[in-house]
Structure formats: structure tokens, C-alpha cells
């Protein structure tokens, strides 16, 4: 028997996920594990590689329009307001399908939802240049295309959370989610680097064609080698039917009455707000504060740091859980690094700093923020594995909304005060608030069980 956790009532588990037995507190009815839902280790490795590539291409497709916006504006005579309308369309579509995508993934399997959405946004990406030249109403067509891109991509991370909760043992979820985050950072880098070269050499259309083709090829590979002929509907053992029926009757309202759920959502909102603000305003900060600096340095180095940082954070969280440390303790420590230690590197930017110091601080802050992959981002699978996709979608929707609000507030502060210190102070305050709430109210015990107080894995 594995060593017991002491911080949150869970037990460590170092062996195969197929060797575990599940007992439910207050009932103590022995139940068979839902073994057929879990990936074998070789299959898990294949999925990690494919999902890493998928998240990379997802962000390449997402970044294509922002990178090409200047060239497209020149070609179609868009104003700044027109460009903003097109780019903003993605956000509204992205928020629309977060909960729906997660709910569908929980019911029919996240693999199916992810594949169907990938085919859709790959096709739309490849067809974007054709739509742009289809009629004289280019602005309306591109705004609608951008909105639909958000709708199609909005299901990706909720479906990923659902997949992770259903197919991956608890002690390996942090690394999977962190690997997906590192793939998104790589996609941002590739879109900014290779995309800019293609834009200059072959025109803006080439970027959409290339990314759409590669994304379609990825979806085809996913279907041929991992999806075809496989039933991905969540399976249940005979002895787990009673538990499932109770979970099915659990109202959503009961989840929203749980302090750990709101602590997780608020922490995610605060971190998303800080991250989106840095993502949006750091290039302007460097350009205004260090006008002689080389642009590729501060645009590339932080994201190069973020890739190994995300993988390291996920590995560390899984390592300590498998060593027998409490899941709640590990999640809070990872979130402390993602928000608390990150803020320690943001605070110096409020004063006078040299260019090398600013690059180091920003790179460290961006890198540390990825540790959330072993904290709040995977905590939803601890709290409510039966509806992890839908709950993650709810959390991610509010994260995106809060991010847009804080980006706008930061722009207002910069315009009114003509100072960057207020923005970095605001980021620090928001992070401290979210972290404090999560440290006090956060938990890792299941809250989606109507009649049970906790689940103990032996």
C-alpha cells in the first residue's frame, strides 16, 4: 500500500493506475476502478506528442490574423478600428463555446470533440484568403471568419481537460496539461518567426494556406493512428453505476456553492488577467522604455523560457504527488510560484531598470506563470472529474473575459498616468488577491459527489 497523504486525505500511488482500488468515504463500498477509461503508458505517450503538436498548430492558426493584420489592412484599406473589429471577433467566439465544448466532451468523449473542431478550424484557416477575396464585403467576412475561428477553437482546452480527467491517472495530469501549454508557446514562437518570414517573402495568404494545410494533416494523422475504429465514450464498470447515477443528479448549483470551486476560478481569472496584460503590453513597454533595443530579443526569449518551464512545472507537480505529498499542498505550492514568485519579478519593473534586467525579469515572470499547469489548471480535475470539461470551460471563459477587461484598464492607466509603474503594480495586486483566496479556500478533494465527503485511493 502506498504512503498516505497527510494534507488532504488522499493517498500516494506510484504503481500502475490499473492496480488501484477505490473506496468512498461515508459509504465504504468497494468499487472497481474504471480501468478501461485510462490510457496505457505507451498510448499516453502517443497522445501527449499529438496533443502537443495540436496545441502548437492551434496557436499558429490563432496568431495568423494578428500577424497578417497590418498587411491585410493595407490591402483592403482598413482603419485601426476596422482591424480591431476583426481581431476582437475571435474573443467573442472563443467565449461562446467554452462551457458547451467541455460539456460535450464530458458526455461523448473529448477526443471526438477535439478532432471535429480541429478539422473545422484547419479548413477555415486555409479558406481565409479565399473568403477575403470572395466579395467587396471583406471586413464583414473577415470579422465573421474570426468569430467562427474563436467558436471552433474555444472547445480545445475544455475538451483537453475532460480527456485528462477521464484518461490520465491523477499523478500524471500535471505534466500533460503543462505539455499542452508549452505547445501553445511554441506555436506563438513559430507563428511570429516563420510566419513573419513567409509574410515578407510570399504574402499574407501563404501563412493561412500553410497553417491550414499542416493543421489538416495533423487532424488526418490523429484520425488514422489514434481515433479510427476506437470508441471514446466514457465507460463505466457495473459497480460504478450507482456512483455515476448520483453524479448525474448533482445540480450545477451545488458546485457553485463550494468555496474551493470559486477559489480556483478566481485564481485562474487573476492569473489570466495578468498574463494577457503582459502578453498585450510588454512589446509596447520595451519599445517605449528601450527604443534602441533589438525587438526579437524581448519578443522571443520569454517564450523560449516558457516552453521548458511549463514542462518542468508539470513534471515537478506529478513527481511530488507520486512521492506521497498531498495533492492540495502540491497544487497550492505550484500556484504560489505561478502567481507569488512571478509577482516578485514583476515588481522591479515598476522602478528604473536596465534593459538586461527587464528582459530577465520578464522572462522569469512568463516562465513561472506556466507553473499553473500543475496548479489551478489541473485542479478542476481534482475537484470535479465527472464534469471537468464543462467546469474548465466555465473557468476559462471567465479567465478570458477578465483578461480583456484588465488589458483595457491597463491601457487606460498608461494613457492617463503616462507611467508603466501603475500597470505592474496592478498586476502584482491582482496576483496577490487571487493567490491569497486560493491559498485560504483552495482544496483538492472532490466536490462533485452529492452524498460523499471524499474519495480515498489506495
Per-range role (PLM):
Residues 180-231:
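Helix-loop-helix hairpin linking two adjacent transmembrane segments in secondary transporters
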Residues 143-184:
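Cytoplasmic helix-loop-helix junction between adjacent transmembrane helices
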Residues 124, 138-155, 345, 356-373:
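Hydrophobic core of transmembrane alpha-helices in multi-pass small-molecule transporters
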Residues 119-136, 340-353:
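C-terminal ends and interior cores of transmembrane alpha-helices
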Residues 63, 90-99, 154, 188-189, ...:
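Residue-level signature of mid-helix packing/kink "hotspots" within the transmembrane helices
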Residues 46-80, 278-283:
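Extracytoplasmic
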Residues 65-66, 258-314, 373, 377:
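Extracytoplasmic gate region of multi-pass secondary transporters
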Residues 2-60:
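Cytosolic juxtamembrane N-terminal segment immediately preceding the first transmembrane helix
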Amino acid at each position: 500500500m502506498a504512503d498516505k497523504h497527510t494534507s488532504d486525505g488522499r493517498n500516494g500511488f506510484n504503481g500502475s493506475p490499473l492496480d488501484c482500488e477505490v473506496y468512498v468515504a461515508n459509504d465504504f463500498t468497494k468499487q472497481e476502478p474504471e480501468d478501461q477509461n485510462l490510457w496505457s503508458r505507451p498510448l499516453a505517450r502517443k497522445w501527449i506528442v499529438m496533443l502537443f503538436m495540436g496545441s502548437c498548430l492551434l496557436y499558429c492558426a490563432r496568431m495568423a490574423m494578428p500577424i497578417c493584420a497590418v498587411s491585410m489592412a493595407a490591402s483592403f484599406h482598413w482603419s485601426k478600428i476596422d482591424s480591431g473589429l476583426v481581431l476582437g471577433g475571435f474573443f467573442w467566439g472563443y467565449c461562446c463555446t467554452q462551457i458547451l465544448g467541455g460539456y460535450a466532451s464530458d458526455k461523448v468523449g473529448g477526443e471526438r470533440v477535439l478532432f471535429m473542431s480541429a478539422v473545422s478550424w484547419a479548413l477555415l484557416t486555409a479558406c481565409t484568403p479565399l473568403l477575403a477575396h470572395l466579395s467587396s464585403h471583406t471586413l464583414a467576412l473577415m470579422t465573421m471568419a474570426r468569430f467562427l475561428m474563436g467558436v471552433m477553437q474555444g472547445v480545445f482546452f475544455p475538451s483537453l481537460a475532460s480527456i485528462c480527467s477521464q484518461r490520465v491517472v491523477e499523478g500524471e495530469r500535471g505534466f500533460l496539461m503543462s505539455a499542452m501549454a508549452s505547445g501553445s508557446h511554441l506555436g506563438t514562437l513559430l507563428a511570429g518567426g516563420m510566419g513573419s518570414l513567409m509574410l515578407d517573402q510570399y504574402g499574407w495568404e501563404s501563412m493561412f494556406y500553410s497553417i491550414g494545410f499542416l493543421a489538416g494533416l495533423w487532424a488526418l494523422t490523429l484520425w488514422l493512428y489514434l481515433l479510427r475504429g476506437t470508441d471514446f465514450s466514457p465507460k463505466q464498470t457495473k459497480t460504478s453505476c450507482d456512483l455515476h447515477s448520483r453524479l448525474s443528479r448533482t445540480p450545477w448549483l451545488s458546485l457553485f456553492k463550494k468555496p474551493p470551486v470559486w477559489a480556483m476560478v478566481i485564481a485562474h481569472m487573476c492569473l489570466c488577467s495578468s498574463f494577457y496584460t503582459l502578453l498585450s503590453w510588454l512589446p509596447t513597454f520595451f519599445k517605449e522604455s528601450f527604443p534602441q533595443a533589438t525587438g526579437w530579443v524581448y519578443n522571443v526569449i520569454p517564450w523560449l523560457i516558457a516552453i521548458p518551464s511549463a514542462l518542468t512545472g508539470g513534471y515537478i507537480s506529478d513527481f511530488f504527488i507520486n512521492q506521497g505529498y498531498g495533492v492540495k499542498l502540491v497544487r497550492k505550492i505550484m500556484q504560489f510560484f505561478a502567481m507569488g514568485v512571478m509577482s516578485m519579478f514583476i515588481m522591479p519593473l515598476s522602478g528604473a531598470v536596465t534593459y538586461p534586467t527587464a528582459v530577465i525579469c520578464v522572462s522569469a515572470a512568463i516562465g513561472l506563470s506556466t507553473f499553473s499547469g500543475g496548479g489551478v489548471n489541473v485542479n478542476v480535475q481534482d475537484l470535479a472529474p465527472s464534469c471537468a470539461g464543462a467546469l474548465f470551460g466555465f473557468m476559462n471563459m471567465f479567465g478570458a473575459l477578465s483578461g480583456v477587461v484588465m488589458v483595457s484598464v491597463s491601457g487606460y492607466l498608461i494613457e492617463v498616468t503616462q507611467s508603466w509603474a501603475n500597470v505592474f503594480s496592478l498586476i502584482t495586486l491582482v496576483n496577490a488577491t487571487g493567490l491569497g483566496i486560493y491559498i485560504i479556500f483552495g482544496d483538492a478533494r472532490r466536490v462533485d459527489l452529492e452524498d460523499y465527503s471524499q474519495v480515498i485511493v489506495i
